Structures are given as structure tokens and as C-alpha cells.
Amino acid sequence: MRVLTKQEIAEACELIAQDAFCADIFDIATETLRFLDPPREISTLEYSIEHRKIRQSDGETADWSLDLTPYLAQPMAALDAPGIHEVIVPKPARSGGTVVAENYALKTMEFGPAGDIMWYLAGPDEVGSYAERVFKPLFEDHEGVAAKIGGGPSDTTLRRKRIGGYTVELLAMSGKTTTNRQGRFIVFDEPDSYSKKFTSNFLEQGRQRQRMVGSLRKIY
């Protein structure tokens, strides 16, 4: 601890009198008011058509189109339906099913209903690959969502984002990642590739993670 000189104390008092150590009230108001805006009523399908960008292999983006995968409209509508809490989609590989979850997640991050999102993949390698290929571009290519990311040093990492007080996180399916956690929207991505322990009970794991969420809970 260092004792300040009289001159330093006088200078500090002068700065205090000038509110030099206070945050700008306009900045505080601007940052806070955006959370008071009522959420826009928009369906996942409408959001997808208006806002969703798909990152191409060459780095360019293209607008998502229902014409290419018209069968995805029904799963999106199911996620929006108040009385439906679990949407199970048996599907072949690369049929666009994961895009449904991505579109719903993007819509809720930008327009609500807000809540923690937990996205489970088979293991660390799968998490790393998805984070680079998809998760990172999701935020880079959608300005409305990116604008809501917190400004703290831990609010944005490759596998985790904090959006308006809630977290969106990629997780490797394991006993450690399925305990003491809670999420409003839980995605089980390619569950057939999970370890035998979780292949048979991943849905029950999700239900346990949503016991305190209430009627807004969704599992995909």
C-alpha cells in the first residue's frame, strides 16, 4: 500500500468533483434500454427467410431458402408451438435438420423468448469442429445477434457466448456436462454418435436439465 501525497489527494479530489471516475450516464442508458424493447413476434420460419445466412465453403454467405428444404417448415413450427416441448426429428445425414435448431436458436437470441441454450455434441473433437465451421459464423454473419453479445472478456469465446445475461454453449456429452446445469433450449446433435451410456437416455438427461424452466422449455 502506498500513501498518497497531499498533491495527489488534491488532484484525486478534483477528478472526483468532475465525475471523472463515473461512467457516462448516456452510455449506461443506451446499453440498458435495448433490453427493454419488447420482443418482436416472429416465427422461426419468418426469421429464417428474412435473416438467416448460410456460410458457403468459399467463405461467402447465401440467404437460407425454404425452397431447398421445404420439409423443414414443420419442425420449425413445432419448436414455436407453445404446447410442444420436445421435437424429435429422425433424419438421414445432411438433410438440413440441424439448421432447424440453429434457426430457432438465432431467433430466440435476437427476438426471444430468451434463455440459456445448451448444444450437445458427441465429444471434444465434434465440439471443436462445429465451433469453427458453424458456431463462429453464426455470430459473425448475423449482426442482430452479434450486437447482443456481452462486452466482458469472458462473454465471447469460440464455444460460448453470453447474450443478454444468458449463455449459449457447445458441450461435449458427458457426465460432467450434464449435471448441475439448466437450459431453456437444449439441442442433442447427432445423438446416435454419443457414447452408449448416453445414446439410450439423452432425452431424459434433457428433461432433468429443464425441471425448473417451466412451459418455455424446448428440446430438439
Task: Show the residue positions of the predicted features.
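Phosphate/NTP-binding elements of NTP-utilizing enzymes
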Residues: 2-220
